[in-house]
Amino acid sequence: MTDCEFGYIYRLAQDYLQCVLQIPQPGSGPSKTSRVLQNVAFSVQKEVEKNLKSCLDNVNVVSVDTARTLFNQVMEKEFEDGIINWGRIVTIFAFEGILIKKLLRQQIAPDVDTYKEISYFVAEFIMNNTGEWIRQNGGWENGFVKKFEPKSGWMTFLEVTGKICEMLSLLKQYC
């Protein structure tokens, strides 16, 4: 992927964490792609946090390095079968949101730019592991947005529900 593509993904990751942390976004706000992603990923994140509360309570994320290590372990398991789809990509963002909330609760000295550091390694993972697939499947606007816009209906709901179940079973391995 190009630097431009990395920048786009990095912006999506930052926008999502700003949404999770309720940080106001200057200017015209997030793009349409970012808004669609926020809606879908936030739904997944809330479901995972609700269903795995006791498990997540036992996970300690005290630094960005700890968050990066845990993120890489979970993503390695998530993608070990080589299958990539939009639902799995959404779970990356949902997990990013879970990590930032855990980190900001447990970090000794939270940094105002912590969300940017998390967004950076998330964007690197997406770029390095799913970038080609994203391109081949219409990109963010012609692939992701068309699939997950609210008008997509039941199929999107069922796919996301399936991804929630997958993420729940993956995270249970770490508790």
From Swiss-Prot:
Motif (BH1): 77-97
Taxonomic superkingdom: Eukaryota
PANTHER family found in the cross-reference section: BCL-2 RELATED, BCL-2-RELATED PROTEIN A1
Induction record: By phorbol ester and inflammatory cytokines, such as TNF or IL1B/interleukin-1 beta, but not by growth factors.
Tissues in which the UniProt entry reports expression: Seems to be restricted to the hematopoietic compartment. Expressed in peripheral blood, spleen, and bone marrow, at moderate levels in lung, small intestine and testis, at a minimal levels in other tissues. Also found in vascular smooth muscle cells and hematopoietic malignancies.
Native species: Homo sapiens (Human)
Gene Ontology molecular function: channel activity
Assembly and interaction partners: Interacts directly with BAK1, BID, BMF and BBC3. Interacts directly with BCL2L11/BIM. Interacts with BAX isoform Sigma. Interacts directly with PMAIP1. Interacts with RTL10/BOP. Interacts with ING4. Interacts with UBQLN4.
Compartment(s) where it occurs, according to its Swiss-Prot or TrEMBL record: Cytoplasm
InterPro entries attached to this UniProt entry: Bcl-2-like_sf (IPR036834), Bcl-2_BH1-3 (IPR046371), Bcl-2_fam (IPR026298), Bcl2-like (IPR002475), Bcl2_BH1_motif_CS (IPR020717), Bcl2_BH2_motif_CS (IPR020726), Bcl2A1 (IPR013282)
Name of this chain's protein: Bcl-2-related protein A1
Ranges spanned by the short sequence motif BH2, renumbered to the chain: 132-147
Function in brief: Retards apoptosis induced by IL-3 deprivation. May function in the response of hemopoietic cells to external signals and in maintaining endothelial survival during infection. Can inhibit apoptosis induced by serum starvation in the mammary epithelial cell line HC11.
Gene: BCL2A1
Homology family: Belongs to the Bcl-2 family.
Example of a GO biological process term: negative regulation of apoptotic process
Record-linked Pfam families: Bcl-2
Location, primary (coarse class): cytoplasm
